[in-house]
UniProtKB/Swiss-Prot annotation:
Leader sequence residues: none
Record-given protein name: Large ribosomal subunit protein bL36
Family to which this protein belongs: Belongs to the bacterial ribosomal protein bL36 family.
Pfam families from the UniProt entry: Ribosomal_L36
PANTHER family: 50S RIBOSOMAL PROTEIN L36, CHLOROPLASTIC, LARGE RIBOSOMAL SUBUNIT PROTEIN BL36C
Gene that encodes it: rpmJ
Assigned keywords, A-Z: Ribonucleoprotein, Ribosomal protein
Record SUPFAM superfamilies: Ribosomal protein L36
GO terms classed as biological process: translation
Length: 37
């Protein structure tokens, strides 16, 4: 899980979702998981 000031999609399986005001990227590749905040 990477915590970054700006999150981006890395591949086409990445999805950007918002949970409790936290922007997250979920993906089939665990290395692509990101969180903003």
């Amino acid at each position: 899980m990477r915590v970054q000031p700006s999150v981006k999609k890395i591949c086409r399986n990445c999805k950007i979702i918002r949970r409790n005001r936290v922007v997250r990227v979920i993906c089939t590749d665990p290395r692509h998981k990101q969180k903003q905040g």
